[in-house]
Structure formats: structure tokens, C-alpha cells
Amino acid sequence: MIPTTATVDDEPGQIKRALIDASAGAISGGVSRSVTSPLDVIKIRFQVQLEPTTSWGLVRGNLSGASKYTGMVQATKDIFREEGFRGFWRGNVPALLMVMPYTSIQFTVLHKLKSFASGSTKTEDHIHLSPYLSFVSGALAGCAATLGSYPFDLLRTILASQGEPKVYPTMRSAFVDIIQSRGIRGLYNGLTPTLVEIVPYAGLQFGTYDMFKRWMMDWNRYKLSSKIPINVDTNLSSFQLFICGLGAGTSAKLVCHPLDVVKKRFQIEGLQRHPRYGARVERRAYRNMLDGLRQIMISEGWHGLYKGIVPSTVKAAPAGAVTFVAYEFTSDWLESISW
């Protein structure tokens, strides 16, 4: 990435850098979200489904009955047959309204935190931060972004989890029903488990991304020193950045998926759900996040915490890669423009 020439105390440079981070973050988030929306819809359908996806997964008798979705391929076919191609982008508008400000805030706050920790606004200096500081910076940036965009995340989950016939035909109808049934606080239903999830997720995602980038840079230097007769540069190529983002997204998702399942259950509890798509999560079904984890373990088994793990991981890997690569390229392009 092309580093900024501003110092920590250079206010005009700080403003320019913040605008670049915010713009590049919003664009990268929007691109990544639009590309991976079908996988996100499939993932959410599994996560909010109380019934077991397999017969051996049945733990408690009162959850018997056929599951709507039993596998990723079957779910893809069902959604396409019943809802058409557009079904894979259900809830994409609130998702974009959530993701774009989320990534905008996240990358802006992340750069400020790393600048403070390293004493420099130069991006090339941030890569040398310790894994601990990279993790903490990512976690705090994720929390700030979550607080700033959460209502749209809630609406995205609600709209993506419903099928046909629709319970909520528009984002406005879902918003009105939440306000009427839960009040303003309802727009932040599930915020606590979301923050609990985002701390390790964002921390791991950014921490491992920086770690993978350092490894790639070391590998490039090694190839240069060994004088291998190929064109080698210590700067990372777009493919190498893609691989780093791929690894970061996959690692974070595999570790934090159970927390995401509980978060989704909190977000839809007490809301209307067509019987065709299985049992609904009753209001106040879980007292807190630990109780949610415990109840899912008791009623659905350990694999209940990993419902939707396949589409979730398949989505997280390219989503992380596309987000980081799009951010790096957009940031470089904006840096090259005369302001």
C-alpha cells in the first residue's frame, strides 16, 4: 500500500487519511457484501432453523419434524425454486446499509488506533505492530463499527431469514413491527451477544491478516535473497493480499461461528415466522448469551452451534479476501489523487 506522508500531528493529513479510510472501507464492504450475499442468505436460514439438519442430530423430542434445509446444495435448490434468483439477495439493501457504514467506521477507527499505537500514520509502520496490538486494535474497531450500524444488521437478519410467503414484504414493514412489538430497544435486540462475538472475530480477522502479510513479506524477502530467477518484490501482489484475506476470514469464522449462531437467535426471537420454515424462536427464549449456548447444546447438540458453518465459512473466506483487497486498492487509488 502507498503510505501517507502525514505525521501523527499533521491535522490536514489526518483528515485526508480519515476520508480515505472511510471511503475505501465503505466501497470494499459494499463490493464484498454484494458478491457474497447468496452465501449469507443460506447461512442465516440454517442458523435460525431450530430443527436438526440430520436425524442423528435430534437431541430433544419436541424439536422433531422435517427440517426445511438439510444441506447447502439442497438449500440452494429450494431457495432458487421457491423464491427465484432474487431470493439470494433477500435483505441485501439493509445489509448494504449496515456493511458500508460498518466497514467505513471499522477501517477509519482501526487506522487511528494503529497510528496511536505505532506513533506514525504511515501504513507501512503499522504492519510491524505486535500481534497483541493488532488484535486489540481490530477488536476495538469492530466494536465501534457494530455500535454505529447495528439496527441495519438486525433488519438484514430478519429479512434474510424469511422465505416465501414473506412475513415482512419491505424493510419498512419489519422496522415498524419491531418498534410496535419491542419498542426502540428492539432495534438493538441481540447487541450484547453481537459485541461479545465481534471482539474475538474482528480481533482475529485483523490480527491474522497482519500476521499473514508479515509472513508473505518475509517469504518475498527470502526469495530475493536466494536469488531465484523470477520476478520477486517485497511488496505484496494482489494475489498475495487475496490469500492473506482468505486465511484471515476463514480463521476468524471457524473460531467464532457458535457466537454468531446465538446472536442470530437473539435477533429474531419473538418475531413472526411462517410455519413452513420451522419453529420460531419465542420471545425471551434465552436469558443471556451463556444461557443461549447452553440451551442450544441441550436441545440441538454441539452441532447446533455450528449450523450453517459450511456456507458461513465458504462465504467468510472470499468475503474477507475481497474486503481487504478492495480496501487496499481503493485506498491506494485515493492516495494517488491530488487533493
Swiss-Prot record:
Keyword presence, Cytoplasm: no
Coiled coil ranges: none
Subcellular location per the Swiss-Prot or TrEMBL entry: Mitochondrion inner membrane
Translocase among keywords: no
Membrane topology per record: Multi-pass membrane protein
Keywords: Membrane, Mitochondrion, Mitochondrion inner membrane, Repeat, Transmembrane, Transmembrane helix, Transport
InterPro entries: Mit_carrier, Mitochondrial_sb/sol_carrier, Mt_carrier_dom_sf
GO molecular function, one term: thiamine pyrophosphate transmembrane transporter activity
A GO CC term attached to the entry: mitochondrial inner membrane
Solcar repeat ranges per the UniProt record: 16-116, 129-215, 236-333
Highest taxon listed in the record's lineage: Eukaryota
GO biological process terms held by the UniProt record: thiamine pyrophosphate transmembrane transport
Function, in words: Mitochondrial transporter that mediates uptake of thiamine diphosphate (ThDP) into mitochondria.
Protein family according to the UniProt entry: Belongs to the mitochondrial carrier (TC 2.A.29) family.
Protein name (record): Mitochondrial thiamine diphosphate carrier 2
Record organism: Arabidopsis thaliana (Mouse-ear cress)
